[in-house]
Amino acid sequence: MKAIDINVKEKSYKISIKKGILSSIGERLKTTYQSRNIVVITDTNVEKFYMETLKNSLLESGFTMKIISIEPGEKSKNLATLERVYEKLCEFQIRRKDIIISLGGGVVGDLSGFAASTYLRGINYIQVPTSLLAQVDSSIGGKVAVDLPWGKNLVGSFYHPDAVFIDPDVLLSLNDKFFSDGMGEVIKYGFIKDKSILNLLDSCKDKDEVLQYIEDIIYKCCSIKKHLVEKDERDLGERMMLNFGHTLAHGIEKYYNYGKYSHGEAVAIGMTYMTNITERMDITKKGTHDYMKGILTKYGLPVNMPDMDKQALVNSIALDKKSSGDRINIIVIEEAGICKIMKIKLREVYGFLFPEDII
C-alpha cells in the first residue's frame, strides 16, 4: 500500500492507495469511530458497480448503512440535489458523530463533502473516489462545492475528509471517455510540476499500459497536491497552480451547460489554448504547445477551442474564484514541468485571450 499524510491547520488525514482496498474499508474504520451509523452518498452508475463490495465490508464490520443515490453528472451538483441530500440525512436521523462516505467521482465527492461540511455544522466524512479524475485531484485538498446557474463551484467551503481510500482496481471498469477525462488532470500535473509524469505517459503505448503504472501515477499526482495544499490550504497563492487550464475550462463547461465537454476535456482545451497564447508571447518555451497537443491527443482529449461566444466566455471568467479586485490570476507554463502565476487586469482579459480581435 502507498500512503500519503496530509497535514493542514485544521486536521491531519491519510490518503491510502491500494488495489482492492474497497473490500477492507469497514475493517479500517471500525477502530476509528464510536458511531456505527454510515450514510453512503453515490450516483446510480457507481452504485451498480461498487456498492455491493462496500456494503459487505461495512456490514461485516458491524456498521449499519443507508444509501443516498443521485443522478450522475455535473447537472446534479446543484442546490436542489443538495437539499434532497439534507432531507435524506434528516430522514435517516443522522447525528454529528455519524459518518458520510462519498463513493463516486468528482461530482459525488464535491456534493457529499459540502453536505458534510454544512449539515449539523459539520460531520465526519470519508472520500472513496471511483474515477481517475477524483483519485488524482478532487478528492484531496478539502475543496467542496456546488454549482450555481452563474458558474461552477460558486457555493462551497474548505472541509477536509477524515480519510481518502483510493482503489485503483475500480478504474478497470472505466470506459475510454471517463479514463480520458481523468488523464486531462494527470497531464496537467505533469506540465505544472513533474515532467517525469509526461515522460511515463509518452513511453506508454495505450490505456492498458498506463494502467500497469497507475498506482505510481496516482501517488505522484497526490504527492504534488499534498505539497501545494499544505503550503497554501486556502488557495491564495501557490495552490492556484493546480488551476492551470481551469479558468477557461469552467467557462467552456458552463457555456455548454455541462453537456458537451467533461471537466477533463474542458481542462485539456483550456491548457492547450492558453499555452498557444503564451508561447506566441515568448512566455512559454517554443515547442511546448505542440508537445502538449500531442500528448493530450494521444489520450483521447480535445485540443481545439470550440466556436463559442467569446464575450460570454470572458464574462464567466470575471466570476472566477481566482479573480481578486480588478485582476485575475492565470496559470501559465514556462516549460514542461514549470509554471507560474500571472496577474491580468479584468478589462484586458478579452485582448489577452483573443488578440486577433484587437486592432
From Swiss-Prot:
Name the cofactor(s). Co(2+); Zn(2+); NAD(+)
Q: Which residues are listed for Zn(2+) binding in this entry?
A: 185, 246, 263
Gene Ontology biological process: amino acid biosynthetic process; aromatic amino acid family biosynthetic process; chorismate biosynthetic process
A GO term for molecular function? nucleotide binding
Please give the GO cellular component terms listed in this UniProt entry. Answer: cytoplasm
Q: In which pathway does it act?
A: Metabolic intermediate biosynthesis; chorismate biosynthesis; chorismate from D-erythrose 4-phosphate and phosphoenolpyruvate: step 2/7
Asked whether the keyword Metal-binding is assigned, the reply is yes
EC top class named in words? lyase
The cofactor note from the UniProt entry for this protein is: Binds 1 divalent metal cation per subunit. Can use either Co(2+) or Zn(2+).
Binding residue positions for NAD(+): 106-110, 130-131, 143, 152
Q: Any keyword NAD?
A: yes
Please name the Pfam families in this protein's record.
DHQ_synthase (PF01761), DHQS_C (PF24621)
Give me the reactions it catalyses: 7-phospho-2-dehydro-3-deoxy-D-arabino-heptonate = 3-dehydroquinate + phosphate
Which domain of life, per UniProt? Bacteria
What InterPro entries does the entry give? Dehydroquinate_synthase, DHQ_synth_AroB, DHQ_synth_fam, DHQS/DOIS_N, DHQS_C
- Cell compartments where the protein resides: Cytoplasm
User: Which keywords does this Swiss-Prot/TrEMBL entry list?
Assistant: Amino-acid biosynthesis, Aromatic amino acid biosynthesis, Cobalt, Cytoplasm, Lyase, Metal-binding, NAD, Nucleotide-binding, Zinc
- Enzyme Commission no: 4.2.3.4
PANTHER family assigned to the protein according to its UniProt record, in alphabetical order: 3-DEHYDROQUINATE SYNTHASE, 3-DEHYDROQUINATE SYNTHASE, CHLOROPLASTIC
Main function: Catalyzes the conversion of 3-deoxy-D-arabino-heptulosonate 7-phosphate (DAHP) to dehydroquinate (DHQ).
Q: Which family does it belong to?
A: Belongs to the sugar phosphate cyclases superfamily. Dehydroquinate synthase family.
Q: What is this protein called?
A: 3-dehydroquinate synthase
Q: Origin organism of this chain?
A: Clostridium kluyveri (strain ATCC 8527 / DSM 555 / NBRC 12016 / NCIMB 10680 / K1)
Protein's gene = aroB
